[in-house]
Swiss-Prot record:
Tetramer of two alpha and two beta subunits. It catalyses: tRNA(Phe) + L-phenylalanine + ATP = L-phenylalanyl-tRNA(Phe) + AMP + diphosphate + H(+). SMART domains: B3_4, B5. It comes from Korarchaeum cryptofilum (strain OPF8). Belongs to the phenylalanyl-tRNA synthetase beta subunit family. Type 2 subfamily. Pfam families: B5, tRNA_synthFbeta. Its EC number is 6.1.1.20. SUPFAM superfamilies: Class II aaRS and biotin synthetases, Putative DNA-binding domain. GO terms for cellular component: phenylalanine-tRNA ligase complex. This is Phenylalanine--tRNA ligase beta subunit.
C-alpha cells in the first residue's frame, strides 16, 4: 500500500497540533495507519483512497473524524475560464487530457510545495502506473497565456528549457540526455517520432508529458495561481487524478476554475467535475451487512464524518460522493464507510457454530504450484494480470479474431469491461510495456480465464491455465516447444502437436497442444506485424495450456 510522508509543521499549519497518541486514535476511524511520527509524519494509505496521498486530503479526512467539519467540502468554483484545444496529432501518442485552473492558493512555504510534489509523484507511481496511465503537470499560471493547446510535434522541431536545466534543448535531446527522458521516453515512443506538448496560445511549451515540464512555469513558494494538466491513456483515470489535485489545492483556499476541453472529434468536456455523484442505499442493507440496528441519524452522522453528504427518508439513504472519491462502486462501499467511521471495534464477532472441517489445497492449486516451480526453474518471471480487461486489449491489440466473451453490463471503465478468455494477450501487453528492458525476456502467468459454455446452468466456466512468452532476437518455435515439453515431463504427461492456423500466429509456425488426444492449448510464433503494432521489435513465441480439462482430473 502507498506510504506518504509530510512535514509535521506544514500539517499543523493546515490544521492544528496533534500528539502521536491523538493522531493514532483518529486514524483508527480511517483507512490509514501511522508509519512514523517526528519532524516528518508518515501515513500508510489503502490503494483505493488515492485522495489520501495528499496532505490536504488527509487533513480533510481527519477534520471529519474529529467532528470539526462534516459533510462535503464546500469549494469555490468558477465555470469555464478558458479552453484547452486538443490536436489530432496526440491521438496515437497520448490521447487524453483534462485540466483545471486553481486561483488564490496558499502555497507560501517550501514545505507546502514539497507536500504537493510528493502527492503528485505518488499518484504517478500508483494510479498513473509509473506515468504510463496518468501524468500530472503543475504550472505557475502567471507565466501562461491561454487558451491552451495540447498537440504533438516532431521531436527534432521542438525546443524549450526543461525543468531544472538552464539551456534550451530540443525534445530529442531531452529524451536522450536528461534523467527523466531516459526513464520515461519509452512511454511515448512512436514511428513518427512525435512528442505530445502542452502549449499556450503563443506556442510556448509548458510541458512535454509524461516526461518533463518547462522551466518557464516552475512552481516557487508564494505562487498563487496554478494551472493543472493531466494527460494519459485512460480518460477516467486522468479525470480522477485531476479531481484529487484540484480539490487538494482548494483545501488551501483556492478557487477552482473549470475549463472546456475541445477534442478534434467534436467532443467538448468540462473539467473538473464540480457536481457530486449520487448513490441510494437501503438502510436495512447497511444494518444487515454490519449486524447493527443503527438508526437513520446514526448512519447519516457517520457518512457526514466521512466527508460525504447524506440524508435518510423512507428507509433509503441518499449519499452524495465527491469527485475525488472513486471507491464507491456498490452499496457495500457505503456500508463499509459507515463501519469505518463508526469504529470497527464496535462491530461484534462470533465464532461459527458446529463447524468441524479439515482444509487442504485444491488439486488445481497443487498443480499450479508445481507448474510455477518448473517455470521459474526454466528462467521465466511470473506476472499477474487482471481477469477483467477490454475487448481492445483482448482482441484488436494482439490481432486475434473476435469471439463471444463474458461482458460486464455496467463497467466502471472500458479498460475492465470483459472477462478474459485467454492469458497470452496480457503477456504480449506486458512485453510491449517493457521494450526498454534488456532481452531475452521470459515471462509466464498462471491464472483463470472465463469461457462461454452453453451446457452449464450459468453458461460459463472458469479454466485454470498457464501461458508463457519468450522474446529475443533469435527465438523460435523450437525454443518455446522445448520449454513446454520440459513442463509436461515434470507433470508426468506426454503431449503431441497438431498443425493449426489461427491469428495472431505465423501460419505454419502454430500448433494445437494435445494431451491424451484432447486439445489443451496452443503454441506458436507471433506474427511480426502484430508485434510491430505493439512496438515489439524482436520475435516472440508463446504457449498457453489448460491445467484442468473438462471431464478430466487436473494435471498432477
Amino acid at each position: 500500500m502507498p506510504v506518504v510522508s509530510f512535514s509535521r509543521r506544514e500539517m499543523e499549519r493546515l490544521w492544528r497540533s496533534l500528539s502521536e497518541e491523538e493522531l493514532t486514535d483518529l486514524l483508527d476511524f480511517t483507512k490509514m495507519n501511522l508509519e512514523s511520527f517526528g519532524e516528518e509524519v508518515g501515513f500508510e494509505v489503502t490503494s483505493d483512497r488515492m485522495d489520501l496521498v495528499t496532505l490536504e486530503g488527509i487533513v480533510r479526512c481527519l477534520k471529519g473524524i474529529s467532528n470539526e467539519e462534516l459533510g462535503l467540502p464546500k469549494y469555490r468554483v468558477r465555470r469555464k475560464a478558458f479552453e484547452v484545444r486538443v490536436g489530432e496529432g496526440v491521438a496515437k501518442v497520448r490521447p487524453y487530457v483534462v485540466a483545471a485552473l486553481v486561483r488564490d492558493v496558499d502555497l507560501r512555504t517550501e514545505e507546502s510545495l514539497v507536500a504537493l510534489i510528493e502527492a503528485q509523484e505518488k499518484i504517478h507511481d500508483t494510479l498513473g502506473r509509473k506515468r504510463r496511465r496518468v501524468a500530472i503537470g503543475l504550472h505557475d499560471f502567471s507565466k501562461v497565456k491561454p487558451p491552451i493547446i495540447y498537440d504533438a510535434r516532431r521531436a527534432e522541431e521542438v525546443h524549450f528549457v526543461p525543468l531544472g536545466e538552464y539551456a534550451e534543448m530540443s525534445a530529442k535531446e531531452i529524451l536522450e540526455q536528461t534523467e527523466k527522458g531516459k526513464i520515461y521516453s519509452h512511454l511515448i515512443a512512436n514511428p513518427e517520432n512525435l512528442v505530445p506538448l502542452i502549449m499556450d496560445s503563443r506556442e510556448e511549451v509548458l510541458s512535454m508529458p509524461p516526461i518533463i515540464n518547462s522551466e518557464l512555469t516552475r512552481l516557487t513558494p508564494g505562487v498563487r495561481d496554478i494551472f493543472i494538466d493531466v494527460t494519459g491513456t485512460d480518460l477516467k483515470a486522468i479525470w480522477y487524478a485531476l479531481e484529487i489535485i484540484s480539490s487538494a489545492l482548494a483545501e488551501r483556499g483556492g478557487e477552482i476554475s473549470t475549463l472546456d476541453i475541445l477534442y478534434p472529434d467534436g467532443r467538448n468536456i468540462e473539467t473538473p467535475r464540480h457536481e457530486p455523484e449520487e448513490m441510494e442505499v437501503d438502510l436495512d442493507f447497511i444494518r444487515s451487512i454490519l449486524g447493527l440496528n443503527l438508526s437513520e441519524d446514526d448512519v447519516v452522522m457517520q457518512l457526514l464524518r466521512a466527508r460525504l453528504d447524506a440524508e435518510c427518508s423512507d428507509g433509503k439513504v441518499r449519499v452524495l460522493i465527491p469527485g475525488y472519491r472513486s471507491d464507491f462502486l456498490h452499496p457495500i462501499d457505503v456500508a463499509e464507510e459507515v463501519s469505518i467511521t463508526l469504529g470497527l471495534n464496535k462491530i461484534g464477532y462470533e465464532l461459527p457454530k458446529n463447524v468441524m472441517t479439515v482444509g487442504r489445497p485444491h488439486p488445481v492449486e497443487k498443480v499450479s504450484r508445481k507448474v510455477r516451480t518448473v517455470m521459474i526453474g526454466l528462467g521465466y518471471q511470473e506476472v499477474l494480470n487482471y481477469i477483467m480487461t477490454s475487448r481492445a486489449s483482448l482482441f484488436h491489440a494482439v490481432g486475434r479474431e473476435e469471439r463471444e466473451v463474458v461482458e460486464i453490463s455496467n463497467p466502471v471503465s472500458e479498460s475492465y469491461s470483459v472477462l478474459r478468455d485467454a492469458l497470452f494477450p496480457g503477456l504480449l501487453a506486458f512485453l510491449a510495456n517493457n521494450t526498454h528492458v534488456r532481452y531475452p525476456q521470459k515471462v509466464f502467468e498462471i491464472g483463470d480465464v472465463v469461457l462461454i459454455d452453453e451446457r452449464l446452468e450459468n453458461k460459463t466456466r472458469d479454466e485454470r491455465r498457464v501461458a508463457a512468452a519468450y522474446a529475443d532476437d533469435s527465438v523460435g518455435f523450437e525454443d518455446i516447444y522445448s520449454h513446454l515439453k520440459v513442463l509436461f515431463e515434470n507433470l508426468s504427461y506426454r503431449i503431441e502437436l497438431e498443425p493449426r492456423k489461427e491469428r495472431p500466429f505465423i501460419e505454419g509456425r502454430c500448433a494445437s497442444v494435445l494431451r491424451e488426444g484432447e486439445e489443451v492449448g496452443v503454441i506458436g510464433e507471433i506474427d511480426p506485424e502484430v508485434l510491430l503494432n505493439l512496438g515489439i521489435t524482436v520475435p516472440v513465441a508463446i504457449f498457453e495450456v489448460a491445467l484442468k480439462v473438462p471431464g478430466k482430473e487436473p494435471l498432477t
